[in-house]
Protein backbone atom coordinates (compact mmCIF):
# COMPACT_ATOMS: atom_id res chain seq x y z
CA UNK A 1 0.00 0.00 0.00
CA UNK A 2 1.43 3.44 -0.92
CA UNK A 3 2.49 5.72 1.89
CA UNK A 4 0.01 8.48 2.65
CA UNK A 5 1.23 11.99 2.09
CA UNK A 6 -1.90 13.67 3.36
CA UNK A 7 -2.16 15.62 0.10
CA UNK A 8 -4.92 14.13 -2.06
CA UNK A 9 -4.32 16.59 -4.91
CA UNK A 10 -0.68 15.51 -5.10
CA UNK A 11 -1.63 11.82 -5.00
CA UNK A 12 -4.31 12.16 -7.69
CA UNK A 13 -1.98 14.07 -10.04
CA UNK A 14 0.37 11.12 -10.07
CA UNK A 15 -2.35 8.86 -11.50
CA UNK A 16 -3.71 11.24 -14.14
CA UNK A 17 -2.67 10.76 -17.77
CA UNK A 18 -0.42 13.39 -19.32
CA UNK A 19 -2.24 16.47 -20.60
CA UNK A 20 -2.23 17.48 -24.25
CA UNK A 21 -3.07 15.85 -27.51
CA UNK A 22 -1.68 12.39 -28.01
CA UNK A 23 0.40 11.96 -31.16
CA UNK A 24 -1.02 9.30 -33.49
CA UNK A 25 1.31 8.44 -36.31
CA UNK A 26 0.15 6.13 -39.09
CA UNK A 27 0.73 2.41 -38.71
CA UNK A 28 3.37 0.69 -40.83
CA UNK A 29 0.64 -0.89 -42.98
CA UNK A 30 -1.04 2.50 -43.54
CA UNK A 31 2.31 4.08 -44.46
CA UNK A 32 3.00 1.23 -46.88
CA UNK A 33 -0.27 2.13 -48.65
CA UNK A 34 0.57 5.85 -48.56
CA UNK A 35 -2.13 6.71 -46.00
CA UNK A 36 -0.55 9.46 -43.90
CA UNK A 37 -1.77 11.94 -41.30
CA UNK A 38 -0.45 15.25 -40.02
CA UNK A 39 1.31 13.58 -37.08
CA UNK A 40 3.51 11.77 -39.63
CA UNK A 41 4.72 15.21 -40.81
CA UNK A 42 5.84 16.45 -37.38
CA UNK A 43 9.45 17.31 -36.66
CA UNK A 44 11.19 19.11 -33.83
CA UNK A 45 10.96 22.83 -34.61
CA UNK A 46 10.53 25.43 -31.88
CA UNK A 47 7.80 28.03 -32.37
CA UNK A 48 9.05 31.02 -34.40
CA UNK A 49 12.41 29.34 -35.00
CA UNK A 50 13.86 29.50 -38.51
CA UNK A 51 13.42 26.29 -40.50
CA UNK A 52 16.45 23.99 -40.67
CA UNK A 53 16.28 21.13 -43.19
CA UNK A 54 18.45 19.04 -40.85
CA UNK A 55 15.40 18.66 -38.59
CA UNK A 56 13.52 16.54 -41.14
CA UNK A 57 13.65 12.90 -40.04
CA UNK A 58 14.63 10.00 -42.28
CA UNK A 59 11.08 8.62 -41.93
CA UNK A 60 9.69 11.89 -43.25
CA UNK A 61 12.23 12.00 -46.08
CA UNK A 62 10.99 8.56 -47.18
CA UNK A 63 7.59 10.10 -47.99
CA UNK A 64 9.15 12.52 -50.50
CA UNK A 65 7.99 11.62 -54.01
CA UNK A 66 5.50 8.97 -52.86
CA UNK A 67 1.81 8.78 -53.72
CA UNK A 68 -0.13 9.53 -50.53
CA UNK A 69 -3.54 10.34 -49.14
CA UNK A 70 -3.86 12.99 -46.43
CA UNK A 71 -7.01 14.11 -44.61
CA UNK A 72 -7.50 17.69 -43.45
CA UNK A 73 -9.38 20.94 -44.05
CA UNK A 74 -9.16 23.42 -46.91
CA UNK A 75 -7.99 26.72 -45.43
CA UNK A 76 -10.67 29.18 -46.64
CA UNK A 77 -8.56 32.33 -46.39
CA UNK A 78 -6.28 31.01 -49.14
CA UNK A 79 -9.03 30.82 -51.76
CA UNK A 80 -10.01 33.25 -54.49
CA UNK A 81 -13.02 31.15 -55.52
CA UNK A 82 -15.22 28.47 -53.98
CA UNK A 83 -15.31 26.33 -57.13
CA UNK A 84 -12.77 25.03 -59.65
CA UNK A 85 -9.95 25.46 -57.14
CA UNK A 86 -6.54 24.45 -58.46
CA UNK A 87 -4.39 25.42 -55.44
CA UNK A 88 -5.13 25.60 -51.71
CA UNK A 89 -3.65 25.04 -48.27
CA UNK A 90 -4.63 21.84 -46.44
CA UNK A 91 -4.49 22.18 -42.65
CA UNK A 92 -4.65 19.72 -39.77
CA UNK A 93 -7.91 21.04 -38.33
CA UNK A 94 -10.31 23.93 -38.54
CA UNK A 95 -9.30 25.40 -35.20
CA UNK A 96 -7.93 28.90 -34.86
CA UNK A 97 -4.34 27.70 -34.36
CA UNK A 98 -3.99 26.78 -38.02
CA UNK A 99 -5.60 29.94 -39.38
CA UNK A 100 -3.29 32.56 -37.99
CA UNK A 101 0.32 33.20 -37.24
CA UNK A 102 1.81 30.65 -34.91
CA UNK A 103 0.55 27.54 -36.70
CA UNK A 104 3.24 24.88 -36.82
CA UNK A 105 5.09 24.61 -40.13
CA UNK A 106 4.21 20.90 -40.32
CA UNK A 107 0.47 21.56 -39.80
CA UNK A 108 -0.11 22.80 -43.34
CA UNK A 109 0.48 21.38 -46.80
CA UNK A 110 0.22 23.30 -50.07
CA UNK A 111 -1.96 21.39 -52.54
CA UNK A 112 -1.42 22.15 -56.21
CA UNK A 113 -3.86 20.17 -58.32
CA UNK A 114 -2.34 18.56 -61.40
CA UNK A 115 -3.39 20.07 -64.71
CA UNK A 116 -7.03 19.42 -65.53
CA UNK A 117 -8.02 18.62 -61.93
CA UNK A 118 -9.80 21.00 -59.57
CA UNK A 119 -11.91 20.84 -56.43
CA UNK A 120 -14.60 22.90 -54.72
CA UNK A 121 -14.49 24.38 -51.22
CA UNK A 122 -16.27 22.49 -48.44
CA UNK A 123 -16.25 23.08 -44.70
CA UNK A 124 -15.95 19.39 -43.84
CA UNK A 125 -12.70 17.39 -43.85
CA UNK A 126 -11.37 16.29 -47.22
CA UNK A 127 -8.93 13.60 -48.29
CA UNK A 128 -6.32 14.64 -50.84
CA UNK A 129 -4.59 12.03 -52.99
CA UNK A 130 -1.42 12.82 -54.90
CA UNK A 131 2.37 12.94 -54.88
CA UNK A 132 3.92 14.21 -51.63
CA UNK A 133 6.88 16.57 -52.07
CA UNK A 134 9.22 18.12 -49.51
CA UNK A 135 9.90 21.56 -51.02
CA UNK A 136 12.13 23.78 -48.90
CA UNK A 137 12.51 26.56 -51.48
CA UNK A 138 9.19 27.49 -53.12
CA UNK A 139 7.32 28.77 -50.06
CA UNK A 140 9.94 30.91 -48.33
CA UNK A 141 8.92 34.27 -46.91
CA UNK A 142 10.60 37.26 -48.52
CA UNK A 143 13.38 38.28 -46.07
CA UNK A 144 11.74 41.56 -45.06
CA UNK A 145 8.23 40.09 -44.65
CA UNK A 146 8.78 37.05 -42.45
CA UNK A 147 6.65 37.09 -39.29
CA UNK A 148 8.45 36.57 -35.96
CA UNK A 149 11.61 35.24 -37.57
CA UNK A 150 9.86 32.43 -39.48
CA UNK A 151 11.54 31.58 -42.78
CA UNK A 152 8.88 29.51 -44.57
CA UNK A 153 5.11 29.57 -45.13
CA UNK A 154 5.21 25.84 -45.92
CA UNK A 155 7.68 23.10 -46.80
CA UNK A 156 5.28 20.34 -47.86
CA UNK A 157 3.34 20.09 -51.11
CA UNK A 158 0.98 17.54 -52.60
CA UNK A 159 0.57 17.43 -56.35
CA UNK A 160 -3.14 16.68 -56.10
CA UNK A 161 -4.84 14.12 -58.28
CA UNK A 162 -8.10 13.90 -56.34
CA UNK A 163 -9.94 15.54 -53.45
CA UNK A 164 -12.83 13.72 -51.77
Feature names for model-found ranges:
Residues 1-164:
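OB-fold and OB-like single-stranded nucleic-acid-recognition modules
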Amino acid sequence: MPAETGNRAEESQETLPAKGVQERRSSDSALAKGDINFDDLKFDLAKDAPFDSGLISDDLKQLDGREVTLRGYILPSTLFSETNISQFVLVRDNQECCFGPGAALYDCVIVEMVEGNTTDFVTRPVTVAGKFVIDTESYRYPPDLSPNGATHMAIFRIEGMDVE
